[in-house]
């Protein structure tokens, strides 16, 4: 997952779409128990009821991209219908925010090293 920053938004909404934020909060809330994509999809649509509906494919794509990024863990179980992934958060909310800050700063230091160091030294 490539982080895209929208500074017009606040908090996690700077880097996540609304349904993605809801999905992560759900996984943080269940605290390591893990959830299938179906569980996450149902919870996201319950939480966003009246606003919009999110497709299960969008949830699966997001969860898999977060696994690829190293933000989520998964285990595979075999059940009715074949194999399915059970997703769990690798980081809690604070650790995820640190991860986002680290990724952003790493890229700023790579592309604008002098300017980034100067600005960081001025920030109090």
Residue ranges and their predicted role:
Residues 1-25, 30, 34, 92:
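Short alpha-helical segments that sit at the start of domains
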Residues 94-124:
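Amphipathic alpha-helical dimerization/coiled-coil segments
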